[in-house]
């Protein structure tokens, strides 16, 4: 699962989930994904609500080839599934939102890269979801994420309002406000601390309560 692979009910095939950090792709990456879908599947892509792309009906024996093809354009499947930090999502208008105090994309990218393959979050009790919102409109939907960051500027310092503990599982919950303002250079240390607590003290017996 941590390699972005889910089994399907149909025998001998599986679903591949591709991470699209903060919902941004280059034209080369999109072309590569399309070519891989044509070659290894049925030429159809499923775009998810959390800015991933899924390819269904991939032959089990050809999966390593597919991984290698995607890697040629730095497209990753790693930790797109399983009890890891899932795809870091962001407002779809990040970078050109007229209401944004700044572009959240570089911060989402830095957080994504820091926690990808990070040993502190490889065997958690449950998956962990993070989002970035460009403005108070909260188009990144921070209130339904484990951690949500909403762009803010205070005294000419870039930072974020931080939301924690949201979810849409079997027991849906609106996130709480953890910080009204946290400087941008503190978001990675904050998330690392939250992950360590979640990993050590989080529910592991009942997935519905995790």
Task: Say what each PLM segment does.
Residues 1-6:
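Intrinsically disordered, low-complexity polar/charged tails and linkers
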Residues 8, 13-157, 189:
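Small-residue-enriched alpha-helical segments and adjacent helix-cap loops
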Residues 122-210:
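Mobile "lid/hinge" segments at catalytic clefts and subdomain interfaces of large enzymes
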